[in-house]
Amino acid sequence: MVKLWRRYKPFINAGIQELITYRVNFLLYRIGDVMGAFVAFYLWKAVFASSHESLIQGFSMADITLYIIMSFVTNLLTRSDSSFMIGEEVKDGSIIMRLLRPVHFAASYLFTELGSKWLIFISVGLPFLSVIVLMKIVSGQGIVEVLGLTVLYLFSLTLAYLINFFFNICFGFSAFVFKNLWGSNLLKTSIVAFMSGSLIPLAFFPKVVSDIFFNDTATTEIYTPVMIIVGKYDTSQILQALLLQFFWLIVMVGLSQLIWKRVQSFITIQGG
């Protein structure tokens, strides 16, 4: 473990330094995310105002507000840029520097992202989560219940990030074949955002569509952790959702190893 830490600590530090160096860029993106969350909030407010029911598909306006906030936080913490990084490094030829290092290729990206994710969690995730926990306790929910859901949320959040990371690694490996992933990355991000429930809770989709989406990888990345912390899952549903996350994590890790072995024959160094 100590040897592993020493080997990958520079990548963690690099992730931290990159976030600190480009903090203005990070801040501007977060402002954009917050504006998007406000747009979603007022859209749902208009929907509830035009409805004669206080509940829509089992969600109250308070539930939707909490869902929007935690969807924003969860998306921020589970987002992975590994496919973008691989695509850019393949395009400019700097991928050779990573390939020559005596470290696991995918793990080098993982630990780089973990460095930045730790800072994001401390600066954004933890404050939001603390406020949500306090609000739930003040509203009358049991402390043990709230803390239990929070722990399960964090556990599910970790699994969700790892699933998303290895999914993006698998997608990023196609850069060795196609050489440029910029456009396809944007398309992939939009599709995943829709299917993951980050834009609209899957409970609002037609049953046939929601049943299909519920079992895919995208759902486990956003919808599952958010539904846990919002309190819309009972014990059996939480267990089922976590098992599904474990399943997809194993699949994605195995698939990433398989694809990596296949694409190594396509490696060519561009740039000069």
Could you tell me what each predicted segment is?
Residues 1-272:
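Hydrophobic transmembrane alpha-helices and immediately adjacent juxtamembrane helices
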